[in-house]
């Protein structure tokens, strides 16, 4: 398969609302899972993963019929009325900066998806008058307004040059250095900081802006007497910039920050609407998760592969990170199922299977032939049959609804994934240490990004025959997104995986190939991360709503990876923060 590669510079090494009370997480007894051996000769490893934290009984309890049906109907009616009023507000004639603030608030509150066409039309009008707008006093002399304009246009796929910041050179002719910005407000520096994370390859102005604003905000946190609300905003931004954040998690934070008046929005209707919408969408998530839990329990694969991670709820949380809007329910359904199989198959290749078994399994998946399973050991027969039936069922639904045969594309992505897993298994069993380039060329596929992207492509609501015929290779943005998932994963999991016995990760490849310390290797991996983000930022423009959806999913794959692997492995060890965020996004409504 031919692939569109990144520029060489970035591979330098060559439910129902029943109560306003917060739902409590389930308390389950921790059990160490051990696996039955397939044969006395086979040496089986075990990672001793944490067991599932979310029982099916608990998940089903989230959607028990509620006595508050009348109240829910009233809330739905109120939601629709507020939506109509906000649509009118968007269409009102406003000054450009006021329009930008409104769009920014809608996006950060997580409700912009209701007004996509209106927002796109507003930004298109602004973009068509960009030269005139940027010369006005408020943008010429206002760093905050200019940074907001820049970020929103880039974020929504419009072209805008970093030259918009030319007016903000300091007296020495440098950008954002010396004392040139000491009179700019802290809020403006925060806006510029967020804008700088939309930089493309070679944009030195934005790189300097990132350095300067990061230092400024760090100093702000240390200053006594500074505005506490602004300090909280700065701390949130320094932890992760907006462009790197999982959208739904940020939306909840932003709504609650507005409730605490840490953030100020111009129109109180927006906050009221956002709270109602968040809770309404959360009810949808509960119902989707409940149906998926019934499917997973009935499938019974967990009992047959007790050595593997059982992570249905966390797998669903991934999909909310990738496509949170209610309209993408079919993608969330198919991809949650896919995530469960990715996890199980990954553990077979990484931990449990012998090399001979793995070669057989890869061959059977590549053939996609149910008649070939007789050559597999029993545990693999169950796994392949479950995968085969589930993927074919997803393909059948698309065929029934759209008359399109997506099964060849789905099975190709699973074959690619298993082949990449097999390469890593051979490296491990043969004690081979790959170069960093060899490693990255294989593992951007083994992180499962292409399989996720393929599911998004095939489950898209507006998929056409022509779109399907064009899907002959993975686009560049899918590669960059997958690479980010791989690198984030490596930073979080490599130490534990090497200790239990696994192939060298990107960090160890750098250390071995270049003779550097682990600390230096980690910094080199972080630079790869920044480089791939720059590439993705340069590929956000879309020619159609279909392409726009796919590129958004690609970006959100990276954002969700950042969440799950930021400051540790929150997927393998699914208690702690992961449990907190499951409760926040999927279970507890906003009060």
From Swiss-Prot:
**Cofactors (names):** Mg(2+); Mn(2+)
List residues binding Mg(2+) 1: 346, 350
BP GO terms, sorted: diterpenoid biosynthetic process; green leaf volatile biosynthetic process; monoterpenoid biosynthetic process; sesquiterpene biosynthetic process
**Cofactor binding remark:** Binds 3 Mg(2+) or Mn(2+) ions per subunit.
Question: In the UniProt record, does the keyword Lyase occur?
Answer: yes
Record field: catalytic activity: (2E)-geranyl diphosphate + H2O = (R)-linalool + diphosphate; (2E)-geranyl diphosphate + H2O = (S)-linalool + diphosphate; (2E,6E)-farnesyl diphosphate = (S)-beta-bisabolene + diphosphate; (2E,6E)-farnesyl diphosphate = (E,R)-alpha-bisabolene + diphosphate
Binding, Mg(2+) 3: 497
Q: Which domain of life is it from?
A: Eukaryota
Enumerate the UniProt keywords alphabetically: Chloroplast, Lyase, Magnesium, Metal-binding, Plastid, Transit peptide
Query: Which Gene Ontology cellular component annotation is one that this UniProt entry carries?
Result: chloroplast
pH-activity relationship: Optimum pH is 7.5. Active at pH between 6.0 and 9.0.
| EC supergroup of this enzyme | lyase
According to its UniProt record, in which tissues is this protein expressed? Highly expressed in flowers, petals and sepals, but almost undetectable in vegetative organs.
What pathway or pathways are given for this protein in its record?
Secondary metabolite biosynthesis; terpenoid biosynthesis
Transit peptide boundaries? 1-46
**UniProt temperature dependence:** Optimum temperature is 30 degrees Celsius.
- For the ligand (Mg(2+) 2), the binding residues are 346, 350
For this protein, what is the EC number?
4.2.3.81, 4.2.3.-, 4.2.3.55, 4.2.3.47
TM stretches of this protein: none
Q: Output one GO MF annotation.
A: terpene synthase activity
Location of the motif DDXXD motif: 346-350
Q: Which family does it belong to?
A: Belongs to the terpene synthase family. Tpsa subfamily.
What does this gene product do? Answer: Sesquiterpene and monoterpene synthase involved in the biosynthesis of volatile compounds present in floral scent. Mediates the conversion of (2E)-geranyl diphosphate (GPP) into linalool, with trace levels of myrcene, limonene and (Z)-beta-ocimene. Also acts as a sesquiterpene synthase by catalyzing the conversion of farnesyl diphosphate (FPP) to alpha-bergamotene and beta-bisabolene and to minor products including alpha-curcumene, cis-alpha-bisabolene, beta-farnesene and beta-sesquiphellandrene, as well as seven other unidentified sesquiterpenes.
Record's PANTHER family?
A: OS04G0344100 PROTEIN-RELATED (PTHR31225), TERPENE SYNTHASE 12-RELATED (PTHR31225:SF252)
Name-wise, this protein is Monoterpene synthase 8, chloroplastic
Origin species, per record, is: Hedychium coronarium (White butterfly ginger-lily)
The UniProt gene name for this protein comes to: TPS8
């Amino acid at each position: 398969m031919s692939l569109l590669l990144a520029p060489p510079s970035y591979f330098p090494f060559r439910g129902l609302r029943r109560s306003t009370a917060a739902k409590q997480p389930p308390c389950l007894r921790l059990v160490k899972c051990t696996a039955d051996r397939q044969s006395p000769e086979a040496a089986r490893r075990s990672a001793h993963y944490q067991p599932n934290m979310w029982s099916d009984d608990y998940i089903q309890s989230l959607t028990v019929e509620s006595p508050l049906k009348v109240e829910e109907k009233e809330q739905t009616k109120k939601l629709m009325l507020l939506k109509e009023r906000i649509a009118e507000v968007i269409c009102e004639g406003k000054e450009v900066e006021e329009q930008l603030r409104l769009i920014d608030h809608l996006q950060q509150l997580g409700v912009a998806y209701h007004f996509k066409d209106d927002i796109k039309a507003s930004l298109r009008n602004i973009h068509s008058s960009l030269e005139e707008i940027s010369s006005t006093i408020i943008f010429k002399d206002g760093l905050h307004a200019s940074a907001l304009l820049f970020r929103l246009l880039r974020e929504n796929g419009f072209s805008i040059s970093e030259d918009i910041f030319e007016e903000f050179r300091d007296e020495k002719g440098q950008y954002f250095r010396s004392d040139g910005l000491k009179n700019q407000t802290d809020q403006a520096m925060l806006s510029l900081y967020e804008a700088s994370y939309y930089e493309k390859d070679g944009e030195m102005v934005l790189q300097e802006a990132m350095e300067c604003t990061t230092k400024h905000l760090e100093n702000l946190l240390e200053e006594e007497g500074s505005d506490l609300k602004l300090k909280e905003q700065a701390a949130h931004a320094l932890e992760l910039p907006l462009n790197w954040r999982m959208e739904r998690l940020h939306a909840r934070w932003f709504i609650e920050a507005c409730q605490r008046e840490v953030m100020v929005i111009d129109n109180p209707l927006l906050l009221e609407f956002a709270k109602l919408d968040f809770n309404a969408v959360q009810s949808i998530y509960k119902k989707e998760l409940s149906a998926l839990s019934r499917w997973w329990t009935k499938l019974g694969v967990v009992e047959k592969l007790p050595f593997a991670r059982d992570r249905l709820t966390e797998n669903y949380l991934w999909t909310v990170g990738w496509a949170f809007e209610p309209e993408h329910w079919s993608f969330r359904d198919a991809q949650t199922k896919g995530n469960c199989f990715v996890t199980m198959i990954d553990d077979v290749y990484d931990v449990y299977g012998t090399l001979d078994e793995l070669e057989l399994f890869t061959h059977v998946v590549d053939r996609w032939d149910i008649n070939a399973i007789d050559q597999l050991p029993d545990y693999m027969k169950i796994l392949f049959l479950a995968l085969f039936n589930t993927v074919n069922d997803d393909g059948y639904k698309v065929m029934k609804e759209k008359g399109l045969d997506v099964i060849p594309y789905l099975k190709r992505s699973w074959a690619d994934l298993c082949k990449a897993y097999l390469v890593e298994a051979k490296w491990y069993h043969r004690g081979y240490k790959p170069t960093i380039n060899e490693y990255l060329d294989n593992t951007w596929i083994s992180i499962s990004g292409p399989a996720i992207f393929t599911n998004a492509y095939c489950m898209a609501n507006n998929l056409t025959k022509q779109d399907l015929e064009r899907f002959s290779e993975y686009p560049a943005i899918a590669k960059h997104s997958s690479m980010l998932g791989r690198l984030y994963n490596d930073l979080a999991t490599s130490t534990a995986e090497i200790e239990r016995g696994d192939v060298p990760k990107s960090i160890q490849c750098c250390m071995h190939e270049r003779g550097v310390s682990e600390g230096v290797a980690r910094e080199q991996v972080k630079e790869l991360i920044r480089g791939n983000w720059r590439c993705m930022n340069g590929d956000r423009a879309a020619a159609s709503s279909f392409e726009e959806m796919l590129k958004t999913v690609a970006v959100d794959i990276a954002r969700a990876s950042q969440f799950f692997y930021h400051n540790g492995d929150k997927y393998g060890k699914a208690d702690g923060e992961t449990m907190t965020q499951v409760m926040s996004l999927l279970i507890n409504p906003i009060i």
